[in-house]
């Protein structure tokens, strides 16, 4: 469980100005306020200091970097967002020295095809680099306080990795057809969240009526939205508000916080396709 938490920093409730004062992964927050007791207990059982990563997180992060940076460009070529010629021109123009030139030359000459060879050889070198960094900085990584990713520095393979990310940002993700998909997704999420927000506007007593299966004509629309919520998330909400949490000054504050979490967890658990279908349903499209 600790290895799944990429950003173990907790929210800055009393010092919002603290955001941006750190760099790298320490500047991001990955633990909800409600999850703090669980992560604290997890850290105590594993010997992790507050805000420190589990060592396996660094390996998982490196694996993500290796797989996605290559897959994004390969997928862009397969979908004809970018031609192989355009990709090669961008990579050659990066001027990463002999390592890049040799990697491209051998991949183009390979009988298996460009991407299989490119992916295999770059992955091999990146895995070796990650392993070397992990061993070299073993003590800092085991402490959970290592501030960087494993794949950093001036090593040729790391420089190529950075170049692949830059090419993806500038020549794939900024293409009109890709941005159109992002706008469609943004509109869908915004529409779903805006519609379900009416459940947050309800007084606690009215939301309790929905939980009890009651509600008059004034809750006509809210009741139908409520019926679409996941039973699993509703169960988690009921458990969270069943007993008083001393971290909240008021019971109403606790209830509303977990109602927000209920909707947030429900929406964030949607697949892209489901979120779009939900948006169309709620919009009458």
Language-model-detected regions and their locations in the chain:
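Sequence-structural signature of the catalytic-core scaffold of metal-dependent phosphohydrolases
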Residues: 1-114, 127
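C-terminal amphipathic alpha-helical interaction region
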Residues: 213-281, 285
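Secondary-structure capping and boundary motifs in well-ordered enzyme cores
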Residues: 51-59, 115-119, 123, 152-160, ...
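Substrate-recognition/cap regions that form aromatic- and gly/pro-loop-enriched pockets
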Residues: 139-240
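Hard-cation-handling environments
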Residues: 99-152, 170
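Zn2+-dependent metallopeptidase catalytic domains
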Residues: 132, 207-208, 279-283
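Divalent metal-coordination and catalytic microenvironments
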Residues: 64, 189, 267
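Short, charged/polar, low-complexity loop and linker segments
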Residues: 42-47, 167-172, 246-254
């Amino acid at each position: 469980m600790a290895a799944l938490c990429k950003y173990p920093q907790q929210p800055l409730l009393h010092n919002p100005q603290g955001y941006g004062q750190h760099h790298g992964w320490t500047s991001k927050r990955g633990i909800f306020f409600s999850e703090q007791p669980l992560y604290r207990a997890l850290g105590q059982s594993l010997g992790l200091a507050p805000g420190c990563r589990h060592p396996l997180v660094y390996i998982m992060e490196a694996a993500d970097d290796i797989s996605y940076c290559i897959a994004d460009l390969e997928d862009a070529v397969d979908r004809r967002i970018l031609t192989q010629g355009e990709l090669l021109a961008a990579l050659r123009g990066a001027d990463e020295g002999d390592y890049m030139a040799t990697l491209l030359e051998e991949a183009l000459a390979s009988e298996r095809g460009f991407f299989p060879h490119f992916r295999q050889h770059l992955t091999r070198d990146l895995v070796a680099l990650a392993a070397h960094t992990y061993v070299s900085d073993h003590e800092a990584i085991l402490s959970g306080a290592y501030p960087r990713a494993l794949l950093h520095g001036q090593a040729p393979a790391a420089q190529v990795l950075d170049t692949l990310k830059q090419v993806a940002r500038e020549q794939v993700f900024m293409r009109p057809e890709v941005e159109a998909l992002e706008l469609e997704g943004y509109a869908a999420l915004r529409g779903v969240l805006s519609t379900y927000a009416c459940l947050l506007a309800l007084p606690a007593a009215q939301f309790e009526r929905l939980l009890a299966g009651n509600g008059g004509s004034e809750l006509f629309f809210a009741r139908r939205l409520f019926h679409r919520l996941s039973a699993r998330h509703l169960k988690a909400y009921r458990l969270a508000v069943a007993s008083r949490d001393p971290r909240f000054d008021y019971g109403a504050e606790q209830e509303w916080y977990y109602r927000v979490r209920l909707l947030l967890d429900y929406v964030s658990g949607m697949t892209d396709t489901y979120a779009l279908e939900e948006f169309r349903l709620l919009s009458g499209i």
